[in-house]
Regions:
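Transition segments tied to proteolytic processing and entry into folded domains
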Residues: 2, 25-308
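Bacterial N-terminal signal peptides that target proteins for export
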Residues: 2-12
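Hydrophobic helical h-region of N-terminal Sec-dependent signal peptides
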Residues: 13-17
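N-terminal signal peptide c-region/cleavage motif recognized by signal peptidases
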Residues: 21-23
Length: 308
């Protein structure tokens, strides 16, 4: 490696390694645990595309999309392995690479980007210790611009490089469109309070679950009980009444906001129902909602639902 390239790699390494110092929770992933190194862990960068079996899930892609200032389709033109001693924090079985890529398309973002750029990424070695062959491969990068360093990008998480395919790009574009639409649901940050109020008839009543949001706007879940019928519930991301009986469909942004960011248990003191039985019913309704939402599955190691 030339002395000039040594200096470039050293400078860029300092920028890219800043990713490790930023917990993923600060990038909008509740309960997330950052990976041990750039590009490490299941689904490591460049090992699979966004539609392969066992690959990134809806939640993974939504996490990356919300963290990224730029989503870029690029073709890798050059890979230079960084010596391990110049790659602090490198996980075992990984290698750090100085990548040169040619821009194919700017899928999302407003920051200017040139015809080519450089970035750092960690990639898994195979069983024989061989490096992956990604030259001329198209990839999707979830990144941010580096202030004062035109021509450099910084991946937003360790797994923010993924192999490109037409299906993968279409999936990313669909999720981005939902996240960026004018009526996209606000980010949920927790549970403010919940209460069950019984009705006039035995078995009749309603649980209201009021949610905290990032921008302080209204959001709530309503669970309605009628005698002889299964509980019905819905969510409202505004001051309007919840659409009872029409809960969010899986793999929608509404579902993502709830399934991936509601805690497993409401925080202590948030259940404000008047009596013991009412508090038990409110807690049971909360568990029912979580059960119907199902698991927020992630394969990129970026977090899970938190404990209350």
């Amino acid at each position: 490696m030339s002395s000039k390239l040594h200096r470039l790699v050293a400078n860029l390494a300092g920028v890219a390694l800043a990713v490790q110092a930023v917990p993923v929770v600060a990038q909008g992933v509740t309960g997330g645990n950052s990976g041990p190194g750039i590009g490490s862990g299941a689904g490591a960068a460049g090992s699979r595309d966004l539609t392969s079996a066992g690959g990134p899930t809806f939640a993974d892609i939504a996490d990356l999309s919300e963290s990224a200032g730029l989503v870029v389709k690029a073709q890798i033109r050059k890979m230079v392995r960084v010596e391990d001693e110049r790659a602090p924090g490198l996980a075992q079985g990984m290698a750090r690479f100085y990548m040169t890529a040619q821009t194919q398309a700017l899928i999302a973002g407003k920051a200017p980007i040139g015809e080519s750029f450089v970035y750092l990424v960690d990639l898994p070695l195979d069983a024989k210790g061989k490096v992956p062959k990604l030259k001329k491969q198209d990839v999707l990068l979830f990144a941010r611009a580096v202030p004062g360093r035109p021509g450099e990008l910084q991946l937003v998480t360790p797994t923010a490089q993924q192999l490109w395919s037409e299906q993968a790009e279409a999936r990313v574009r669909g999720i981005l469109q939902s996240l960026l639409s004018g009526n996209a649901p606000v980010k949920i940050t927790g549970v403010r309070e919940l209460m069950y109020v019984p009705g006039n008839l035995a078995g009749q009543g309603e649980t209201q679950i009021f949610l905290n949001t990032k921008d302080g706007s209204a959001a709530s879940i309503t669970v309605h009980h009628e005698p002889g019928a299964a509980p019905a519930w819905g969510v409202s991301f505004s001051e309007l009444v919840a659409d009872i009986g029409n809960p969010p469909r899986p793999e929608t942004v509404e579902w993502y906001r709830l399934a991936c960011f509601l805690p497993n248990n409401p925080p202590q003191g948030t259940n404000v129902a008047e009596g013991i039985e009412e508090r038990r019913q409110a807690a049971a309704d909360y568990r029912m909602v979580l059960g119907e939402l199902g698991e927020c599955r992630r394969t990129l190691g970026q977090g899970a639902r938190t404990q209350g």
